[in-house]
Amino acid sequence: FPWQRNKASFGERLQRPLVEALKGRDTPGRILTYVWGGGAAVGEGFENPYTGKYGRMIIRKAPGTPLNTWHPEAVNVRQDFIDAFGFEPVDPLYIAVGSDSDDTGVMLRSSVRGLAFCASASANASTGDDTTN
């Protein structure tokens, strides 16, 4: 999500010129990361170890979730942002999809289809349908 000066702490406002000099003016101000696995329960969130308080990781699937099958997902990004950071988000700046085997030495393959932003996350999740109208 874009950096929002009006929502930034004093310290964040002091640091921002350095962040922009090192990483660019469009460097996100807040980051939500949805992950499969981890030690927390599904739905729980925790501070992103790479971004500190500016990022939140949210567990979507537990270790041991069946492989080789489609897993429809729907999230309420707006509410997750509010829960994580305490204020309303502006429109997202970037969407990234990736996978990481956490240095396990394994090879993995995954696919994504029907990625979309909808007015309501509950409509597609309840039917398992990954298409949007």
What does each model-identified segment do?
Residues 95, 110-117:
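Extracellular beta-strand elements of beta-rich domains used
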Residues 123-133:
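A cross-kingdom marker for long, charged
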Residues 67-105:
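Extracellular beta-strand ligand-recognition surfaces/modules
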Residues 44-68, 80:
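A mid-sequence, solvent-exposed acidic-amphipathic segment
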Residues 1-53:
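Extracellular/luminal beta-rich ligand-recognition
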Residues 27-31, 39, 60-77:
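Trp-centered recognition loops
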Residues 4-8, 103-108:
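Short, surface-exposed beta-strand/loop "edge" segments at domain boundaries and coil↔beta transitions
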Residues 2, 114-123:
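Short beta-strand-to-coil "C-cap" segments at the C-terminal boundary of structured domains/repeats
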